[in-house]
């Protein structure tokens, strides 16, 4: 038991089992969500535009990060080391891809540039190159020990410091960059919208609702990284202050929210109107008519929704005529 407590930083074997189960379950959800976006990109040609290509790379990084979080086993040396390096590499790549999406949106909307597709090679060099560099630097502080269910975290003071500098420092740099960038984009669009309202007497309410929905969606993007890694950052700082004492509930929140990052990204970035439209069109082609009624309204093909509404209107008219005759 003493060996378990030492390796787990004060956690019991039961605590470690619970955290491991949470990590596996949350990582599996992220893997499925990210794999779904990757599959949609591969199957639907209409999604292979530059903007969604960046989302594809983000989902691919999340998928591989989630996969290695699942397969890591602290009881097996080689697999443990492999998980530590690959998880670090792909998790860093994931939040770096979010900065390229923010940069692309800012360059297009705020600076009115149309050359973003020419920057794809630079994006790859920036994301994969930076991820490789910080992963190699992290190996210098690797003391070949693990903490809890993850082979990714370190127990030694030097390992903790290097881990913080090579992951959490660039992570919060990306969060600050994304937040500032989306703030500028949203402010730019809102100012343009006010000018449009001032120049016209009538504004399409439907367009307004759609624009506000998009603006609100962009505002949530930086919150995904904050929600995924805030508890992990607090836990790492706590490890510095009290290295021999682990807080169980904080470890649960750390592992659970971090492992769900891929799922959050797949929903926010990937499951957009273009993806839903592509799915609707395939459902309309292959799904039998009798199964439409069992689908939620937002998943039904558009033509079927129109037909369903027309049928409802006709049935209401028939019932009204019947009442009038009576």
Swiss-Prot record:
Organism: Arabidopsis thaliana
Gene3D superfamilies for the chain: Rhodopsin 7-helix transmembrane proteins
All ranges on the Cytoplasmic side of the membrane: 45-51, 106-120, 182-213, 268-326
Residue intervals annotated with topology Extracellular: 2-23, 73-84, 142-160, 235-246
GO MF, one annotated term: G protein-coupled receptor activity
Disulfide bonds: 80-151
TM helices/strands, residue ranges: 24-44, 52-72, 85-105, 121-141, 161-181, 214-234, 247-267
Biological role stated in the UniProt entry: Together with GPA1, may regulate the cell cycle via a signaling cascade that uses phosphatidylinositol-specific phospholipase C (PI-PLC) as an effector and inositol 1,4,5-trisphosphate(IP(3)) as a second messenger. Promotes PI-PLC activity and IP(3) accumulation. Involved in the blue light (BL) signaling. Together with GPA1 and ADT3, required for BL-mediated synthesis of phenylpyruvate and subsequently of phenylalanine (Phe), in etiolated seedlings. Probably involved in cytokinin signal transduction.
Family in the record: Belongs to the G-protein coupled receptor 2 family.
One annotated Gene Ontology cellular component of this protein: Golgi apparatus
Pfam families: Dicty_CAR
Chain positions carrying an annotated carbohydrate: 143
Effect of deleting the gene: Improved drought tolerance accompanied by lower rates of water loss. Impaired sensitivity to gibberellin (GA) and brassinosteroid (BR) in seed germination. Hypersensitivity to ABA and glucose (Glc) during and after seed germination. Altered response to blue light (BL).
Membrane topology: Multi-pass membrane protein
Protein name from the UniProt record: G-protein coupled receptor 1
Residues recorded with modification N-acetylserine: 2
Induction record: Modulated during the cell cycle with a peak during the early G(1) phase.
